[in-house]
């Protein structure tokens, strides 16, 4: 299937890799189908691209590559709605806000994208935890005193 991407232009995608967001994304409830596209120049970052709207795309990254101690629990409703049966089937990404210069860019740890990769079901999961920011630095977090 051919789609248009504001970041990558015209691109062929595998329809089996289309992610279903049954509730859409916050602010984009009508957009329910997205695909993760690789950024060839930098495998650490990806594009979460709407299948139907070329202008709706987010740069995402694996938050664990930057914040190794990042952790949270999913509620039962989310586990059921995403049909999660095994932790191994789950992928977590954080949406980035790109800034100039790039090292000032941030990631949203407060509302990660949670994906059941086996079922291709996903949602943006808003955490009710004060310890995570929606504008966390992409710079490695400072070590705690004594580390």
UniProtKB/Swiss-Prot annotation:
InterPro entries: Flagellar_assembly_factor_FliW, Flagellar_assmbl_FliW_dom_sf. It is found in: Cytoplasm. Gene3D superfamilies: BH3618-like. GO terms for cellular component: cytoplasm. One of its GO terms (biological process) is bacterial-type flagellum assembly. Pfam families: FliW. Its main location: cytoplasm. Keywords: Bacterial flagellum biogenesis, Chaperone, Cytoplasm, Translation regulation. Belongs to the FliW family. Interacts with translational regulator CsrA and flagellin(s). Acts as an anti-CsrA protein, binds CsrA and prevents it from repressing translation of its target genes, one of which is flagellin. Binds to flagellin and participates in the assembly of the flagellum. This is Flagellar assembly factor FliW. It comes from Oceanobacillus iheyensis (strain DSM 14371 / CIP 107618 / JCM 11309 / KCTC 3954 / HTE831). The gene is fliW.
């Amino acid at each position: 299937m051919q789609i248009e991407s504001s970041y990558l232009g015209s691109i062929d995608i595998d329809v089996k890799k289309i992610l279903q967001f049954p509730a859409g994304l916050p602010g984009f409830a009508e957009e329910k189908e997205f695909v993760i596209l690789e950024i060839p120049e930098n495998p650490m970052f990806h594009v979460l691209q709407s299948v139907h709207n070329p202008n709706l795309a987010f740069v995402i990254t694996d938050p664990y590559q930057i914040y190794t101690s990042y952790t949270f629990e999913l509620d039962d409703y989310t586990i059921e709605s995403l049909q999660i049966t095994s932790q191994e089937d789950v992928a977590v990404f954080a949406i980035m806000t790109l800034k100039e210069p790039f090292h000032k860019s941030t990631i949203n740890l407060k509302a990660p994208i949670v994906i059941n990769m086996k079922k291709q079901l996903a949602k943006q999961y808003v955490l009710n935890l004060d310890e995570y920011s929606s504008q966390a630095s992409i710079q490695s977090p400072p070590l705690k005193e004594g580390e």
